[in-house]
Design a protein with these regions (language model features):
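Extended, non-catalytic subsegments within catalytic or DNA/protein-binding/adaptor domains
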Residues: 1-190
Length: 190
């Protein structure tokens, strides 16, 4: 049996490259960028922000109503309620704060721009203009095609976004606990 090639992390530099290869005036591209930047800054696994083939269940998966963007003049960030994840087997949920970074990779700016196109109708947060929900296969396929179009070779997968975010924090010499600073326990009042 052949060993699977190692998954390549989607680093900050690759995120910038992805950003430069998307036409953000296109609503579907704006949606992909919002999903990628949300996942990267939130250290999200693909199952925490996409819809599975079995369909969307708002009691388990992230609905648009659990994504709160502070749209005031001085936006502080976005609050997500992740209801279930691999690291939350009892589905207690966790509140996750994504800060405004005021840079090209800012998850708040990308979500605000995308939500302008999407509107606030019920359902999963990340929808293509034809109403199809973003899935793991979409994330992996688009990630691979965007990076291939940019001339980047590698075994990229949706998990590479999570790995890349963690690698970037580690490589930036943040204290070990910094990658956990954006997580707010379920009991924390907001």
């Amino acid at each position: 049996m052949q060993a699977r090639p190692p998954r390549v992390p989607v680093t900050r530099d690759l995120m910038l490259l992805i950003h430069s290869h998307l036409n953000l005036a296109d609503p579907d591209s704006a949606m992909l960028w919002a999903a990628f930047s949300t996942a990267w800054f939130g250290f999200l696994r693909v199952s925490e922000f996409t819809t599975p083939p079995s369909g969307f269940d708002p009691s388990i998966y992230l609905p648009i109503s659990d994504l709160m963007v502070d749209c005031h003049l001085h936006t502080l960030g976005v609050l997500l309620l992740i209801k279930a994840s691999k690291t939350d087997p009892f589905h207690q949920g966790v509140k996750l704060f994504l800060p405004c970074t005021c840079g090209m990779l800012c998850p708040v700016a990308s979500l605000s721009a995308y939500l302008h196109h999407r509107g606030n109708s019920a359902g999963p947060p990340f929808l293509f203009t034809d109403g199809t929900a973003l899935s793991c296969l979409h994330v992996t396929g688009r990630l691979r095609s965007l990076l291939a179009d940019a001339g980047v070779q590698g075994n990229f997968s949706s998990h590479g976004v999570w790995i890349g975010a963690a690698t970037s924090v580690n490589g930036a010499a943040f204290p070990t606990h910094s990658s956990e600073l954006s997580v707010i326990s379920p009991a924390t009042p907001i």
